[in-house]
């Protein structure tokens, strides 16, 4: 059975007018249930991740400031969310949801987190709505537990996974691949194992051809587990993305990646990442397509 990490705490209350579309974390499971794509049995509520697991990916001083709610105001502004006990609890549960999802993927082939994809969080900083890097934390958990030896992170959010790249810069057992808008945030990029910077305005056929040509190359690393970050800020409707992908192409992107995982018998954990279209229905539809494609391929 496909398992999906979700908890009501994911939809964290934000000040009125905040630009982050937090409502999507309520609407995604709601829509999947309404359409009969999933049942309540597919959903699980993760607990908070343990401190010792966080510290395999994040610096002790940074974690202590988060834990004690003493992160300087300037650093909180860089993250984009006002720090609070409830926000911290949310982040801890999202990270554990990705760990649990990775363990479920070992059993069922695929698992999802309705949130996560917090790839801008580096070892000692947070930014861009990211505090703790869920897929980095989960990858280091799998390595330290001896469950996997070669982990591939496929990051197709429109923004480079700079935090993920920094965390694993000197880790030979994790291969980081980021395909992103070259001129988009973050403006000072880190070095992934493979970065493909896309020009503004790239359309469906060109984007999908680059991905099709690149996926087989990733097998040279000989991964035995994959984390996939399926951001939908690549859509032509996205107000931050600057690319020109249709909803159909975004869905085809997901199908290509997840079929690749299935064809090569590679378990995959999927986190949702970003999406900033003005109409929240576009965001939710595109995210739900990721679930539909994955469930169709693996279930």
Language-model features: locations:
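A general "terminal functional-core" signal
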Residues: 73-299
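Metal-dependent C-N hydrolase catalytic cores
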Residues: 2-136
């Amino acid at each position: 059975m496909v398992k999906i990490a979700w908890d009501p705490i994911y939809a964290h209350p934000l000040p009125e007018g905040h630009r982050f579309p937090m409502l999507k974390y309520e609407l995604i499971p709601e829509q999947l249930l309404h359409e009969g794509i999933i049942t309540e049995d597919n959903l699980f509520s993760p607990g908070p991740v343990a401190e010792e697991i966080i510290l395999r990916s994040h610096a002790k001083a940074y974690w202590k400031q988060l834990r004690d709610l003493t992160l300087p105001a300037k650093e909180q502004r860089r993250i984009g969310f006002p720090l609070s006990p409830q926000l911290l609890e949310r982040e801890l549960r999202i990270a554990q949801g990705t760990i649990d999802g990775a363990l479920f993927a070992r059993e069922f082939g695929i698992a999802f987190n309705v949130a996560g994809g917090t790839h801008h969080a580096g070892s000692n900083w947070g930014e861009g709505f990211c505090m703790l890097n869920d897929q980095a934390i989960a990858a280091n958990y799998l390595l330290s537990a001896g469950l996997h030896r070669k982990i591939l992170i496929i990051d197709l959010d429109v923004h480079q996974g700079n935090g993920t790249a920094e965390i694993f810069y000197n880790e030979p057992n994790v291969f980081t691949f980021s395909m992103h808008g070259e001129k988009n945030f973050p403006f000072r990029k880190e070095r992934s194992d493979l970065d493909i910077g896309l020009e503004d305005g790239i359309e469906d056929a060109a984007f999908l051809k680059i991905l099709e040509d690149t996926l087989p190359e990733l097998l040279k690393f000989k991964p035995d587990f994959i984390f996939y970050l399926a951001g939908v800020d690549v859509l032509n409707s996205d107000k931050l993305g600057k690319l020109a992908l249709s909803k159909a192409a975004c869905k085809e992107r997901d199908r290509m990646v997840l079929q690749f995982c299935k064809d090569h018998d590679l378990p995959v954990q999927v986190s949702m990442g970003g999406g900033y279209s003005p109409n929240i229905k576009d965001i939710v539809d595109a995210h739900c397509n990721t679930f539909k494609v994955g469930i169709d391929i693996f279930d």
